Amino acid sequence: MSSTRMPALFLGHGSPMNVLEDNLYTRSWQKLGMTLPRPQAIVVVSAHWFTRGTGVTAMETPPTIHDFGGFPQALYDTHYPAPGSPALAQRLVKLLAPVPVTLDKEDWGFDHGSWGVLIKMYPDADIPMVQLSIDSSKPAAWHFEMGRKLAALRDEGIMLVASGNVVHNLRTVKWHGDSSPYPWAMSFNEYVKANLTWQGPVEQHPLVNYLDHEGGALSNPTPEHYLPLLYVLGAWDGQEPITIPVDGIEMGSLSMLSVQIG
């Protein structure tokens, strides 16, 4: 057991271009890497590994996945060679039981939702990492409960990093001109922040029932970028501080909100 409890982070990752850029959000990720206790290992949950069933990367050297198209060549030339941890993958299999977890040794790696933020936090890529997939067949409350199980790792020197965007509607993105947030995007983003510290039965949690908000479905036409937040909220002990390292809405409907537990 580690003497220092590791924080749990939800990071709004946004565009892959953040890898190449220096902006408010990337600087906040850099600051987290410089100021938080250094983890022995990282478990990352990314919106970009959305599967039927649960998988975890279990290879020694996971590949860098460039899961995007139409970006500058410099982005495809960027790699994040962080080591994997088959031992940590096996630990997750036991910790998450009876949920069946598949050990992935060849199909996935670190996608841009994970390495795109961690390359700013830990640019030396020298911390062992595994990536856990998001089961597309499960309801929101189930993902919150997965976070509760993962919380135990925080006392073992392992940091939980979840990566997504709480408002993620690419169909309404303002690619050019006025990039001011849509009112519904602002409303939902504020709703998320207002309910981060809510306590009560999981099934009644406002952020588990996020689609009940009038802007919930428009902010998240699909759930994969929202669900990573629930893993982090599930890992909260109900007493630790919850802070917001950075916030903002880009291109009208892309929230860059980040949340820190502990």
What kind of feature is each model-predicted range?
Residues 47-51, 62, 109-118, 166:
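Short glycine-enriched loops at secondary-structure junctions
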Residues 94, 98, 127-128, 136-141, ...:
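Surface-exposed, charge/polar-rich loops and edge strands
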Residues 75-83, 105, 133-140, 216:
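Flexible, glycine/proline-enriched loop segments at strand-loop-helix junctions
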Residues 2-3, 35-36, 121-125, 152:
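Solvent-exposed alpha-helices and their adjacent loops that cap or buttress functional pockets
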Residues 89-144, 149:
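Internal, conserved structured core segments that host functional sites
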Residues 9-10, 67-72, 122-130, 207-208:
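Short, basic/glycine-rich phosphate-binding loops at helix/coil junctions
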Residues 2-103:
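A short aromatic-anchored loop/beta-hairpin motif
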